[in-house]
Amino acid sequence: MYRDSPLMSTPVANDSRSDEGPSGKLSPTCLFPSFTCDFLDGDSSFECCSIDPLTGSHYICRRSPRLLTNGYYIWTEDSFFCDPDGHITLNPSQTSVMYKENLVRIFRKKKRTHRSLSSLLDPRASKSWLHGSIFGEVDSLPSEDLWLDGIRSLGSDLDCSLSDGWESQKPVTDTSESSSSGYILPQSLRESSQSSSLQLQVKASGHFEKNSLVHSRAGLMHKVSFQAILLAVCLVISAYTRWFVGGELASIFTCALLITIAYVVKSLFLNLARYFKATSCARFDST
């Protein structure tokens, strides 16, 4: 198998007649170069054995441009034969051309990464869930960013429209006054926004204080009711022990009940004092 042989090619006339003998015989170079390796090179050329009947000159064969670069000639011993006079005749039925095609994939699909079950169950993949930091790197939602950008753009458009209207009403000579007024208007808008934010903060703090007072009052009522019930139970037990049981056992029960009553009364007065102190501070802050 040989690559790109010059056979089966297009003949080109050669003007040189130096190789032609005086009796019209073929030159030695006309013989088929089957025993040389020069003709295997695709860029080399050799003289064919055919003669132009008009000029009597030999043809120089070159590689045909119609032959693809990936073509191969398959020669056998029966592909050509040479007569005693040196004429070479090709047998096309015994000479074949084989082309080796280069398959190129034009459309290449991107490989999708298929995660295996082991990678999904890897504890390192769920590290963010375990530490609770899956939303730690998220600063704000995209909707909030878009909302803030829209407010900024509206504020800038409002400032520009106000300044343009003010400058259109002023004459040309009062350019400095118009620029100063255009600078004052955004300041007034900023001051109004700051005052509104302060009012919102005051309202929120007042609402929080009211809620704290309500919760403290409910907790105090729960504690006071429990301590009052405990005090009443202690008094009833002391009276019954004094009435039905006498002697040293009654004195021991009475001493234990007095200690319990003292502890309950002390905690009750402390809770009442804290409650009245908190209410007075809240009223003073509200005024």
UniProtKB/Swiss-Prot annotation:
One of its GO terms (cellular component) is membrane. Residues 1-25 are annotated as: Disordered. This is Transmembrane protein 71. It is found in: Membrane. The chain crosses the membrane at residues 218-238, 244-264. The keyword Transmembrane applies. Keywords: Membrane, Transmembrane, Transmembrane helix. The keyword Membrane applies. It is a multi-pass membrane protein. Belongs to the TMEM71 family.
